[in-house]
Amino acid sequence: MPLHKVPVGLWKRLRLREGIYSRLPAHYLRSLEEARTPTPVHFRPHGAKFKINPKNGQRERVEDVPIPVHYPPESQLGLWGGEGWLKGHRYVNNDKFSKRVKKVWKPQLFQRELYSEILDTRFTVTVTMRTLDLIDEAYGFDFYILKTPKEDLCSKFGMDLKRGMLLRLARQDPQLHPDDPERRAAIYDKYKAFVIPEAEAEWVGLTLDEAVEKQRLLEEKDPVPLFKVYVEELVEQLQQQALSEPAVVQKRANRT
């Protein structure tokens, strides 16, 4: 007899159907459920279920087993390109007959200054060589942030940048190069393929706790008094009535 009525692996998904979680926007809940497999970084996938053994020529079954990666809190403040810490063991003095001790492999980190066209800001970010290569492949820092999915960014800082970029693109913010409208229009046209509604952009990159807090604040807004609603409706009706009625022009008497 099973210990739990529902498997433990489904608890997080079922929690989204109850309480305030169920009232989160549909597009945000969909982004949680449609989690994709991250791009392999620390191992090379076989790309097939079977391979030929070069020694005996027999077909053997192979399986892609991802290496467990640990992402420290520092990785959320930079852009590591999916790299993290690998925990394992090594032999003392590279001698297999010696004692085996624990070892942690860490990526090499660099401090680089990256410029965002959309935000018109320079950021000093901790990056890896893989991140710089990915930025070059994407033809720019903004393209890298906008194109890379959440599972491959592996960075809270990167997702916050993406939310800021999407909000500026959705609002067509005139504060971007206010003295050069042609340059501003060229930038917005360059990234127009990534434009999404502002209501969706506000939720991009939020953790579940942040999304719940945002939803709670939206629901706890002070209600608008009814007299204000009625006054606004009355003003609109009077304005429409004034526009629909023909204007009467009185002629002045000619002085002799």
From Swiss-Prot:
Q: What InterPro entries does the record point to?
A: Ribosomal_bL28, Ribosomal_bL28/bL31-like_sf, Ribosomal_bL28_sf
One GO molecular function term of this record is: structural constituent of ribosome
Q: Where is the transit peptide?
A: 1-55
Q: Does Ribonucleoprotein appear among the keywords? A: yes
Primary site of residence: mitochondrion
The listed locations are:
Mitochondrion
Give GO cellular component annotations, separated by semicolons: mitochondrial inner membrane; mitochondrial large ribosomal subunit; mitochondrial ribosome
Query: What family does the entry list?
Result: Belongs to the bacterial ribosomal protein bL28 family.
Q: What is this protein called?
A: Large ribosomal subunit protein bL28m
Species of origin reads Bos taurus
Q: Which gene encodes it?
A: MRPL28
